[in-house]
Amino acid sequence: MKNSKTSNKWMYLICFLFCQITWSQTVFGKWKTIDDRKGSTKAIIEIYKEDGLMHAKVVEILEEGKKGALCTKCEGERKNKPILGMKIMEDFEKNNKGIYKGDKLFDPEQAMTFKGRDWLDDDNKNRLKVRGYLAFLYRTQTWHRVLEN
């Protein structure tokens, strides 16, 4: 009987820890971007926290023939700079609904900055919804979490 109680305690502990890990998913980490028009993989983006705000940068380019791409359409300090290492999100704040919002979501292909929102998919916490706004128009991409081995 004693072994049965001990086994039950271990099962409860394992279930509790599993639930904690599952529920504690955050937006922070590495994400694979998928072109929502073509369906092709484009890059790995690292989302990180700096000074209490969310930021993101390109850490790997996956798209064929674009590994050393420069931001040729960009202006100012980004003009002709490598896309690899470029910050694409700056100063996003989390609201009370778990959505990160900011005014600096940069698309190096279009060389444009948008207002943006990011949130974890309710159905799959390994998917991140990234939405860029230009006035009342918007476009949403789904990024996939890079699972570390």
Regions found by a protein language model. Give the residues of each.
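Bacterial Sec-dependent N-terminal signal peptides
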Residues: 1-26
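Short, hydrophobic/aromatic-rich segments at coil-to-beta transitions
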Residues: 25-30, 96-103, 125-129
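Central antiparallel beta-sheet cores of small beta-barrel/beta-sandwich binding domains
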Residues: 35, 40-106, 113-114
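Well-ordered beta-strand positions
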Residues: 48, 93, 119-122, 144
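Acidic, glycine-rich flexible loop segments
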Residues: 103-125, 130
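Short, exposed beta-strand-loop hairpins at the edges of beta-sheets
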Residues: 129-139
